[in-house]
Amino acid sequence: MTTQLDSLRNMTVVVADTGDIEAIKKYQPEDATTNPSLILSASALPQYASLIDEAIAYAKSKSNCSKQQLIDAEDKLAVNIGLEILKIVPGRISTEVDARLSYDTQATIEKAKKLIALYNEAGISNDRILIKIASTWQGIRAAEELEKQGINCNLTLLFSEAQARACAEAGVYLISPFVGRILDWYKANSDKKDYAPAEDPGVISVTKIYNYYKQHGYNTIVMGASFRNVGEITELAGCDRLTIAPALLKELQENNAPLERKLSYTGEVKAKPQPLTEAEFYWQHNSDAMAVEKLADGIRKFAADQEKLEAMLLTKF
C-alpha cells in the first residue's frame, strides 16, 4: 500500500526537521535540517553525551580563554550532530549560524566559514552542507557573499515576499519560508481560529513564493518549513522540498489516502525585475506586520535556546 509519505516523495524532496538520529533512520529523508532549538533538544538525548564530551575536549584544545572555549564548543557540537546525521542522509545537513549574529553581515560570514571548516576537517565536502542564516537584510548580504565563495546557504525565518525576493536576487541556494508560524500569528491576531489547509495563510504565502520564483526563472530552491498539521504539508505537495518534523512524518507514513500534487508551474518565464534596494526591502518587509513580528520573534527564540545550550555546556567544562 502506498503511503502519503511515499506519494509525497514522488513529487517533493522530503527533509527531516530534527536532530534526532533515530527519527532520521526511521523516515529516511533525503536531507535534514537543524536549528539552535533542535540542537538543544537533541543534546539532551543520552546517545549524544559523547558528542558533547568531544566538543568540550576540542574547545579546550583550541583555547585557554573560557569565553572562546564556549563558542568553540557550541560550534563543534552543532557540527558533531550534523556529522552523525550525514552518516544516515544521502543529501545535505543544514547547520545554523548563531541567531545573535543575524544583523551582522561580516560576523555571519566568519561564523559560516568556521562551521564549514569544521565539516571540511571531518572529511565532509561543501556540497553536503547548507549554512542556515536568518533572512534579515544583513543575513541575505552575507549569504550572497558566501554563495560566491562556494558555500551554499539556507535562508530561514522567512515570512515576507520581500525576504523571498531579496534571497532570490542574491542567488542563495535555498530558502525556508515558514508556514506554521504564519498561521500562529493570524490565529493570535484575528478572530478566525480555524483554517482549512487551502486557506491557511502560511500555505498561501509559500504558494505565492513558489509561483513567483518559477514565473521569473529563479533557481533558488523553495523548502517549506514549520508545519503545524499534515494538511499544510499535503496542500504544498509538489513544492521543491519540505522539511518536516518526525511527528508529522509519522502521520504521513500512517495515512494511505491519495495525495494530489498542488504546486507546479508550467507557464512561460517572465523577465526578472530590478533587484530590491535596501530601502525598498525594508519598506516592503515592514509593510507586513506579521513578517516583522515573526522574524524578530524567531531570532529571539533561537538566541534564547542558544543561551540555554551555552548554560548546559558550561556545566560540562
Curated annotation (Swiss-Prot):
It comes from the Bacteria. Pathway: Carbohydrate degradation; pentose phosphate pathway; D-glyceraldehyde 3-phosphate and beta-D-fructose 6-phosphate from D-ribose 5-phosphate and D-xylulose 5-phosphate (non-oxidative stage): step 2/3. It catalyses: D-sedoheptulose 7-phosphate + D-glyceraldehyde 3-phosphate = D-erythrose 4-phosphate + beta-D-fructose 6-phosphate. Pfam families: TAL_FSA. CDD domains: Transaldolase_TalAB. GO terms for biological process: carbohydrate metabolic process; pentose-phosphate shunt. The active site is at K132 (schiff-base intermediate with substrate). GO terms for cellular component: cytosol. It is found in: Cytoplasm. Keywords: Cytoplasm, Pentose shunt, Schiff base, Transferase. It is an enzyme of class 2 (transferase). Its main location: cytoplasm. GO terms for molecular function: transaldolase activity. Its EC number is 2.2.1.2. SUPFAM superfamilies: Aldolase. Transaldolase is important for the balance of metabolites in the pentose-phosphate pathway. Homodimer. Belongs to the transaldolase family. Type 1 subfamily. This is Transaldolase A. The gene is talA.
